[in-house]
């Protein structure tokens, strides 16, 4: 029975620790990260913390029950007193406390929203870079095949005494350098995956695959995109509102709460020559603090300066967001033009030259190395195009992030 239990437990543990294979698109990876990133999950608890502070804010202090006892040490005379006291605000302090906490709750929610925006941007950048690396690796592999054809041709010419062994060695060295470049691309991929895994919230044993292709540049986004939906701007606005309410709260703090209550006393006193008499009295008790020495001036100055600073922060964050959008759009426009030029002029010209050399080679007018080198130049142009296309999509990601685009969480 024990062995059976151990066996079942082992199977359960093995199933629980089984490596997971994730196959995601660029946007799918961003959505997955928003749902599973552990740091973001921890950040969301700040909303619950702020909600708890909101529940606690604006409440009256608990009433106080006071007791008095006095005893004459030379006789039986003594007194007992009981008082019930409650503090009451002289201003709208409790309402202002609630308003400050409500604004802080809105700021916490906006900060989490901004964290989602920045996380999605980081994941998109890593995913786009991985797609570009895969395409770059394919191009380098084609270049290696092209170089191997040239090496085989040069080796035959060296054996026939028609070419120098140094030229053949140089071609072989270039091919090995390309092989090293492919290995370096594998290193870059490992680094990117190492960056992407914690962002997605997956373990080191899990396999992450990014699917999709880098599409050709499309229409540019419209100018003057709105930034009011960005989390950092909303957080700045909410913090400014909290600071504004805090100024009013600091001014209200000049007037401390007054206390009012009921009191009852019972005394046993000697009334000569009649003896001892008992007296019971009921009354009111009132306490009013006077703002003679502390008028809360320091806190008022501090709160006023903080409110001005928060207003300036809104302007700074909005200006930064607008600058990011303009810069990303300009980068997209420039890179789209580069891709269009390579597609419309350079690659067609390279293909035309390659076809001409192929025809000349078939006619015996051009040696094969020239044809192979022409193919290599075309591969280099395709590699340049891929770099420009990758940078275009990275600029598009910057524009998405700058406008506050956040994907829906993916389960």
Put a short name on every predicted segment.
Residues 1-8:
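Sec-dependent signal peptide recognition
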Residues 10-19:
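Hydrophobic h-region of N-terminal signal peptides that target proteins for export
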Residues 19-70, 87-88, 96, 102, ...:
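Bacterial Sec-pathway N-terminal export signals of envelope proteins
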Residues 24, 115-229, 234, 328-331, ...:
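Periplasmic alpha-helical coiled-coil/stalk elements that build and connect Gram-negative outer-membrane
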Residues 41, 60-79, 88-116, 133, ...:
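Small/polar (Gly/Ser/Thr/Ala-rich) solvent-exposed segments
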Residues 42-54, 115, 119-142, 149-152, ...:
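Amphipathic alpha-helical coiled-coil segments
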Residues 82-84, 284-286:
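Membrane-embedded beta-strands of outer-membrane beta-barrel proteins
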Residues 98-102, 165-173, 368-376:
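Short, charged, amphipathic alpha-helical segments
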């Amino acid at each position: 029975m024990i062995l059976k239990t151990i066996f079942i437990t082992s199977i359960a543990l093995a199933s629980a620790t089984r490596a997971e294979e994730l196959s995601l698109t660029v946007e799918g990876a961003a959505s997955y990260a928003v749902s599973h990133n552990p740091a973001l999950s921890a950040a969301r608890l700040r909303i619950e913390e702020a909600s708890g502070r909101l529940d606690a804010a604006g409440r009256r202090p608990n009433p106080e029950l006071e007791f008095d006892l006095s005893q004459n040490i030379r006789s039986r005379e003594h007194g007992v007193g009981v008082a019930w006291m409650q503090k009451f605000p002289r201003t709208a302090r409790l309402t202002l406390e609630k308003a400050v906490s409500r604004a802080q709750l809105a700021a916490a929610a906006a900060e989490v929203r901004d964290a989602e925006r920045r996380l999605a941007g980081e994941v998109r950048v890593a995913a786009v870079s991985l797609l570009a690396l895969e395409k770059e690796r394919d191009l380098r592999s084609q270049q290696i095949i092209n170089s191997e054809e040239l090496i085989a041709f040069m080796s035959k010419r060296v054996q026939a005494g028609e070419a120098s062994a140094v030229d053949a060695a140089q071609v072989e060295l270039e091919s090995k350098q390309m092989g090293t470049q492919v290995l370096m691309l594998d290193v870059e991929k490992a680094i990117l995956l190492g960056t992407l895994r914690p962002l997605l919230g997956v373990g080191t044993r899990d396999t992450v695959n990014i699917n999709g292709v880098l599409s050709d540049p499309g229409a540019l986004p419209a100018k003057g995109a709105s930034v009011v939906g960005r989390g950092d701007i909303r957080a700045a606005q909410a913090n400014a509102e909290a600071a504004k309410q805090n100024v009013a709260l600091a001014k209200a703090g000049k007037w401390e709460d007054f206390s009012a209550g009921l009191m009852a006393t019972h005394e046993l006193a000697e009334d000569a020559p009649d003896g001892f008499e008992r007296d019971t009295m009921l009354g009111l008790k009132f306490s009013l603090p006077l703002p003679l020495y502390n008028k809360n001036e320091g806190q008022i100055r501090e709160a006023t300066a903080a409110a001005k600073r928060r207003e300036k922060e809104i302007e700074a964050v909005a200006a930064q967001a607008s600058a990011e959008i303009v810069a990303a759009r300009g980068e997209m426009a420039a890179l789209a033009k580069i891709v269009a030029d390579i597609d419309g002029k350079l690659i067609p010209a390279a293909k035309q030259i390659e076809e001409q050399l192929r025809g000349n080679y078939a006619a015996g007018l051009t040696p094969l190395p020239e044809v192979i080198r022409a193919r290599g130049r075309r591969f280099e142009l395709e590699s340049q195009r891929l770099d420009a296309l990758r940078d275009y999509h990275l600029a598009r990601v910057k524009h998405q992030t700058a406008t506050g685009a956040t994907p829906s969480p993916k389960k």
